[in-house]
Regions:
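Membrane helical hairpin/interfacial module
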Residues: 40-108
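Extracellular/periplasmic helix-loop-helix junctions in multi-pass membrane proteins
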Residues: 37-39, 171-178, 237-247, 272-276, ...
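Cytoplasm-facing juxtamembrane segments at the starts of transmembrane helices
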Residues: 4-23, 76-84, 131-155, 184, ...
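Hydrophobic alpha-helical transmembrane segments in multi-pass integral membrane proteins
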Residues: 26-33, 93-102, 156-168, 224-238, ...
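Generic multipass alpha-helical transmembrane bundles of integral membrane proteins
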Residues: 117, 151-265
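Small-residue-rich transmembrane alpha-helices that serve as helix-helix interface/gating elements
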Residues: 254-257, 311-327
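Membrane-interface helix-loop-helix junctions at boundaries between adjacent transmembrane segments
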Residues: 75-83, 99-155, 160-185
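N-terminal signal-anchor module of multipass membrane proteins
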Residues: 1-64
Length: 346
């Protein structure tokens, strides 16, 4: 086959590409966290940070080109009942990068710019995607997958970097940032509860999402891992000391659900693979960020409670994350080299 020209790549550029930035970023952050126990991990963690920053810039070129040169194609994807859910991976990637730059460098200004830009774009995408879905009649139970979590539930990612960044703000700016964090966490958490019920309804009462959408099973782990950590980050800056114990209990409950869902997602994925229902696609990056969110939650919980069991489960999940990330990266590189990954899906 003839390798596609850049204009064609940009015209059909899938919005889900930035799931690669999300997954690589969370691998960098969790590896850096483990470097506290094993200092040798500090160097690969830093390498992942810089690689991911470059990856975002590289992917942003065709993404922005599509909006500038092919706005009709971009808007058409925005109204697609499945593909539209992946547009907010761009804004979530910015929020993850903000956490990276705050963790790996002393460039607080860069982290702040990335965070505010990510916050602004994610609010826009969450309203735009859900507006089309709520107003349209094209969405059916066949279109319901955990990918529906991304636009609204992605709001809970804001306090991951937004909480720690509050110490670098003061006055009205700090109050507005705190307010934005609270809105994001509140809206995303409540939307997760509603969407969780809808996705479980499909699993119980309708045919499962196989094939290209098989990895979306793992997306459940993202809010399970992020919500408690974001809540703890926010409580660090609120005059609610008694709420920390309740938040810790909530984290424990979410973590328990996460352990259970990790096993279930693994079993469902292996079952799909056994019958040839796991073809490679960009959706494989959906394995990485959710699993990384669970790793971060496990390590956070182990530090707060002093539980070695949570730490070892987190390390085991981190090792699995590393394997899945490497496999997906290599398969993606091969697909990019052949041009196959730029063939649009219906």
């Amino acid at each position: 086959m003839t390798y596609p020209r850049f204009s064609e790549i940009a015209r059909t550029f899938a919005p889900g590409w930035f799931a690669a930035v999300m997954g690589t970023g969370v691998l960098a952050l969790t590896t850096r966290s483990l470097a506290q126990q094993w200092p040798l991990l500090a160097l690969p963690a830093a390498a992942l940070h810089w690689f991911n920053s470059a990856l975002f810039v590289l992917l942003a070129v065709p993404w922005l080109t599509r909006w500038l040169r092919f706005p009709e194609a971009a808007r058409q994807t925005l109204s697609h009942p499945v593909q539209a859910n992946f547009y907010p991976t761009f804004s979530i990637a910015l929020l993850v990068l903000a956490a990276q730059w705050l963790t790996f460098t002393d460039q607080v200004a860069v982290a702040l710019v990335l965070w505010w830009l990510g916050v602004s774009l994610h609010f826009i995408f969450s309203f735009a995607v859900l507006f089309y879905m709520f107003r349209g009649e094209q969405v059916t139970i066949d279109h319901v997958t955990p990918a529906n979590f991304i636009p609204a539930v992605g709001l809970v990612v804001m306090p991951l970097a937004g909480g720690p960044l509050l110490q670098y703000m003061d006055g009205a700016l700090r109050e507005w940032a705190l307010t934005v964090n609270a809105i994001g966490l509140g809206a995303g958490s409540m939307m997760y509860l509603g969407l969780l019920g809808i996705t479980l309804q499909r699993k119980f009462l309708h045919k499962p999402a196989h094939g290209l959408l098989t990895p979306t099973i793992w997306i459940h782990l993202a809010p399970i891992g992020v919500i408690p950590v974001s809540l703890m980050n926010l409580l660090e800056h609120l005059p609610l000391p008694a709420a920390r114990e309740a938040a810790l209990l909530l984290m424990l409950l979410f973590w328990g659900f996460g352990v259970w869902w990790l096993v279930m997602a693994s079993l469902l994925t292996l079952a799909a693979r056994a019958v040839g229902q796991l073809p490679f696609a960009l959706s494989w990056w959906g394995f990485t960020f959710p699993l990384g969110a669970f790793v971060a939650e496990s390590l956070h919980l182990s530090r707060l409670l002093g539980w070695r069991s949570a730490f070892f489960i987190g390390v085991a999940a981190w090792l699995l994350l590393g394997v899945l990330w490497l496999i997906t990266l290599l398969r993606t590189a091969r697909a990019v080299a052949s041009g196959a990954v730029f063939t649009p899906h219906p």
